[in-house]
């Protein structure tokens, strides 16, 4: 009987897991994430209803994973790439891997946001890997009031397919 229950849990976990994050499901709590990532660290959040937990340096070229929990339920995963090690060649490799494993993006959206004297400019590509998850591949530059780029970042955002994407 224990084997049947264990088999069911294993099949459930891997059948409904978030793409690229085996064992993690939408709606998981911090406690569930802690089982897979024992070194979760709380990050500051501008939204009091959202807690952000991160894992530093989980893989090569990745600075950290960020897990966004609203009401203690996972509703977004952000992969923050290490901008010191990502160049044009690595960017192309990431894009090629996405298009090879998922397919071509279904949408390209420009990003243009003014925040005080800074401007965020970039693009995001929307991928649909399955019926439960959407993936957004986003490159964003921060431009100061003098028109100079002060920062540049690259993200992969995973969200449940029923959620609206807000950068």
Spans of features found by a protein language model:
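Short hydrophobic/aromatic-rich motifs at helix boundaries and adjacent loops
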Residues: 1-5, 66-68
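Basic side chains
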Residues: 2-3, 30, 76
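Sec-dependent N-terminal signal peptides
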Residues: 3-13
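Short, charged low-complexity linear motifs
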Residues: 9-10, 77-80, 84-85
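Generic detector of isolated residues embedded in canonical secondary-structure elements
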Residues: 14, 32, 57-61, 71, ...
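Non-cytosolic coordination micro-motifs
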Residues: 16-51, 81-167
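N-terminal, post-signal-peptide region of Sec/Tat-exported proteins
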Residues: 40-80
């Amino acid at each position: 009987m224990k084997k049947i229950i264990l088999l069911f849990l294993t099949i459930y976990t891997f059948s409904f897991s978030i793409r690229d994050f085996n064992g993690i499901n939408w709606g998981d709590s911090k406690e569930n994430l802690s089982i897979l990532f024992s070194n979760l660290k709380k990050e500051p959040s501008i939204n009091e209803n959202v807690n952000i937990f991160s894992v530093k340096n989980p893989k090569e070229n990745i600075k950290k994973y960020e897990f966004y929990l609203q009401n203690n339920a996972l509703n977004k995963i952000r992969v923050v790439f290490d901008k010191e090690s990502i160049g044009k060649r690595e960017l192309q490799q990431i894009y090629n891997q996405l298009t090879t494993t998922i397919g071509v993006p279904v949408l390209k959206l420009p990003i243009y946001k003014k925040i005080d004297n800074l401007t965020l400019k970039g693009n995001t590509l929307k991928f649909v890997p399955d019926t439960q998850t959407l993936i957004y591949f986003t490159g964003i530059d921060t431009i100061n009031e003098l028109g100079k780029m002060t920062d540049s970042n690259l993200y992969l955002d995973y969200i449940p397919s029923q959620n609206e994407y807000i950068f």
